[in-house]
């Protein structure tokens, strides 16, 4: 005889089937929800603007992201066309810079609380590292726009040529003249 207020459980066999069915259903539906969406063209355009203007990334990385810097007084930037960084590592690098290199942190609070590689300003000082100041700090969404732009137009796209140059700028420009037609 059952005691009052005792929970009623389905037999183990039915419970196992229910749990299995629920997990299988979740696995079938999850990829559709977890798939990365392609960035909106306006986000890519905003990322290009931020790369060229506010972040002034081209001064070190070159307008094409190929490491051919545009300002000789700036540190040498990486060739972003050949980088193997995934999106998360790219965003972390933009936010936190790279200690020991010329890559500055664009996150206003980088190294204030351990969010960057688990380090704080005191850790950098102790190691004799000084981070360069960025031309401007960027909001998280702005950093994501730059990543959208880089993955759409630069990373993994191979060396720049005349056709890619026109596509990059959206029209024939003076910069494209250096590439044979």
Where are these predicted regions, by residue range?
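Glycine-rich, acidic and aromatic/proline-enriched surface loops and short helix-turn segments
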Residues: 96-100
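Flexible coil segments in periplasmic/lumen-exposed cytochrome c-class electron-transfer proteins
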Residues: 37-45, 53-55, 63, 101-181
